């Protein structure tokens, strides 16, 4: 009996509507009658186009401090009516990026950051990151132990030179 009274006072259930994109899932009025997946992809597209428009707008801003002679046209004059929005997506290139990095620094082979560079021991979170860019275990963390290529002395000299500039006094005039 209680359930009969409850059904008569509650609102009648509405039938769920299918997604407006026709993917077969049920849509929600809060998501513009789209399913969660279609709504997420729609929002991602909107965000991407907004970012692209902002990037185009920022790239087309003219420098405010340029000096142009009277009667001379600006070389970068662009009419906004002819602009089109172009969405650029990153595509994988045919040239591997790791090969370009190896050419720049051939002295050190590439190793994962969770292993010691000297003994190849797993260090996990407890690894010590050196200023030379490698990760080391507890026994190889000191520069003397792993033959560090970073020049600490030169960095120290530069820091002292920047902190203490050379002060020259004026010549003393003799009486």
Swiss-Prot record:
Note the superkingdom of the native organism: Eukaryota
User: What SUPFAM superfamilies does this protein map onto?
Assistant: AN1-like Zinc finger, Glucocorticoid receptor-like (DNA-binding domain)
The A20-type zinc-finger regions cover 13-47
MF GO annotations? DNA binding; zinc ion binding
Tell me a GO cellular component.
plasmodesma
Positions with a binding annotation for Zn(2+) 3: 130, 132, 146, 148
Which parts of the sequence bind Zn(2+) 2?
A: 116, 119, 137, 140
Residue ranges of the AN1-type zinc fingers? Answer: 110-156
Coiled-coil spans in chain: none
Annotated Zn(2+) 1 binding lies at 19, 23, 35, 38
Please give the PANTHER family that the UniProt record associates with this protein.
AN1-TYPE ZINC FINGER PROTEIN, ZINC FINGER A20 AND AN1 DOMAIN-CONTAINING STRESS-ASSOCIATED PROTEIN 7
Give the protein's biological function. Answer: May be involved in environmental stress response.
In its UniProt entry, what is this protein called?
Answer: Zinc finger A20 and AN1 domain-containing stress-associated protein 7
Organism annotation: Arabidopsis thaliana (Mouse-ear cress)
């Amino acid at each position: 009996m209680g359930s009969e009274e409850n059904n008569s006072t509650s609102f009648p259930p509405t039938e769920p509507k299918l997604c407006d994109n026709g993917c077969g899932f049920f849509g929600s009025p809060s998501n513009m009658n789209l399913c969660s997946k279609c709504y997420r992809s729609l929002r991602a597209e909107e965000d991407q186009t907004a970012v692209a428009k902002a990037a185009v707008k920022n790239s087309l801003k003219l420098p405010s401090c340029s000096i142009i002679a009277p009667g001379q046209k600006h070389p970068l004059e662009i009419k906004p009516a002819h602009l089109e929005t172009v969405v650029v997506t990153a595509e994988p290139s045919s040239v591997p990026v790791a090969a370009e990095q190896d050419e720049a620094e051939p002295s050190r082979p590439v190793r994962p950051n969770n292993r010691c560079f000297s003994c190849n021991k797993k260090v996990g979170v407890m690894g010590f990151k050196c200023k030379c860019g490698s990760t080391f275990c507890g026994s190889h963390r000191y520069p003397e132990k792993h033959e560090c290529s970073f020049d600490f002395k030169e960095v120290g000299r530069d820091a002292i030179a920047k902190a203490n500039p050379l002060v020259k006094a004026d010549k003393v005039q003799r009486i």
